[in-house]
Design a protein with these regions (language model features):
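Conserved G/P- and acidic residue-centered "switch" motifs that form tight phosphate/ATP-binding loops
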Residues: 82
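N-terminal beta1-alpha1 cap of cysteine-dependent amidohydrolase-like domains
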Residues: 1-79, 90-91, 97, 101-138, ...
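Hydrophobic, aromatic-enriched interface-forming segments
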Residues: 85-87
Length: 197
């Protein structure tokens, strides 16, 4: 789905292997998407794994954080999707709710045992996300973890029903956006078009 969305937006998609020479990888691309995947190792945000924290791969976490740091140093357009938003937040000093269904006030976001749901999001009016997608819309929700603290990132969107962080961005970069939902499954073409522009 990511490949077709980038292609549809006018970009040339390229899948990056998990290991390799990061500098030459970044030199060969014009923008970076970090997408969904397994849980993030709690060690990256100085916590022990909770009982519901699923399989995680610290090497992937540190590799992705290195890619993100390198891409942003080059002011390369960046889009983090689901886990990609989470690892972007952790890379900026953020923290995670390890399991939303056991976090008071944040139950029911789906994502555990393959559950999926939908809810509204409210977007900050002065954000890049609002200029791309508007100030409120419906998103899919299939994540059992969530960002509890976005670190040095600006919060650009929250879930309408419980205030959970659903969007983050860096205003000092030309395009650095993270979203908790899966825009490629929701037909949110405008995000990919804005990334490729």
């Amino acid at each position: 789905a990511y490949i077709s969305m980038v292609d549809k937006a006018g970009g040339v998609p390229m899948i990056i292997p998990p290991a390799g020479d990061m500098t030459s990888l970044l030199d060969s691309i014009d923008g970076l998407i970090v997408s969904g995947g397994p849980d993030i190792s709690p060690a990256t945000y100085n916590e022990e794994p909770g009982p519901m924290t699923e399989e995680f791969y610290p090497e992937q976490d540190f590799s992705e954080m290195g890619l993100i740091e390198g891409a942003l140093e080059m002011d390369m357009p960046f889009l983090g999707i689901c886990r990609g938003m989470q690892i972007l937040s952790v890379a900026h000093g953020g923290k995670m709710h390890q399991h939303l269904d056991t976090t008071s006030g944040h139950e029911g976001h789906g994502g555990f045992f393959g559950k999926s749901t939908e809810h509204g999001v409210i977007v900050e009016g002065d954000s890049l996300l609002a200029s791309i997608m508007g100030d409120s819309f419906t998103v899919n929700s299939l994540h059992h973890q969530g960002v509890s603290d976005s670190g040095s990132l600006e919060i650009s969107a929250r879930a309408e029903h419980d205030g959970l962080i659903e969007g983050v961005e860096r205003k000092d970069k030309k395009f650095c956006v993270g979203v908790q939902w899966h825009p490629e499954r929701k037909g949110h073409d405008s995000l990919f078009t804005a990334l490729v522009k």
